[in-house]
């Protein structure tokens, strides 16, 4: 019976929905809170050892499981910068993902490091309550309007009839992305150079019109293609910089150190602050614990990650981003090679969850104890992912999707093949098509 109140609901409403689901399906009894997985190890046929750290009493325990699903999410491990002297700061400081609920920002001198999605939400939310807000920008960000609105009556009726998921799926599968009604686009248009260039011109003009100071407007205008990096879907971001208490710092060398009273810049400038908010993103690399499969092979080994490359996924090899060979009964939700930067992740999770549940149930009925992908199926999917990135706009700048561009390869850097760069519809067609009649060509059961 839950119906969202508007198009973009708040964190509180999303949390309420999660609570509703937990109570509706009576699964709270099965949830272990303040328990951190520190290692997964395949120990025997049909058996995984799960090492768990209790964060309350700092003790370690272990359980054994037949199937393991990693649903921790790729954007769940906050990445803090490594500025010298961070421990010296006398004021309050925290990452946006670990927001200090006790922090009182009213009337304070606040600095925020970063201009990504989290930063933009914070900037527009707190500008009116702080004494001053200094935004430390490394890279400008494209933004489009979301024009939030209450859930319309026809959608409410669709919810009541149980058809809203189908409506969402239709919009997503058709490749329509309508958050800004004044700028609709399709998946194909996004990668058309002429179309993209025209959109950049349009959005640049919007920034000029929104920002009173021409110099600030210039600094807030990106120099890379639309959607090459994650785009902000937010209202009032640029106009917030017209407020007298909001200041933009765009030092090319960025922050170099933290001292007792604030941030030191490469230019030598010192910005005195009472609160520092780090909106510095997430470590979107490997699952944040060791996963060891057959014969001691680790997930890091499978994905080409090592200490030399800061354990980034250089060349993940999976089937649909869900299965990894030599890792029987191991499944990843929203894993590498399963989504692109405009994927509707909610729908992806729904379909992957259904796939895993159906697979495990069918194995039980068929008296099968293990499943893993065939090596040839993994190679085939990885090859498809490699080809899928050709011609895509995401290759034209350095971003967390690709971990480097084609040009970087000449300097010895390998761009990541960590995503399925075709449409979400095409991914689901592969997943559902493989699940409905081609399993013997893709999966090995025992």
PLM segments and residue spans:
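A conserved short coil-to-beta-strand element within the FAD-binding core of flavoproteins
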Residues: 33-49, 102, 244-266
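Glycine/threonine-rich phosphate-binding loop and adjacent beta-strand/alpha-helix elements that clamp
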Residues: 275, 279-363
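Rossmann-like dinucleotide-binding core of oxidoreductases
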Residues: 59, 68-202, 271, 325, ...
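Glycine-rich beta-alpha-beta "Rossmann" dinucleotide-binding loop(s) and their flanking helix/strand
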Residues: 68, 72-97, 128, 243, ...
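Feature captures the FAD/FMN-dependent oxidoreductase FAD-binding
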Residues: 4-76
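Helical element adjacent to the flavin cofactor pocket in flavoenzyme catalytic cores
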Residues: 12-31, 54, 230-262
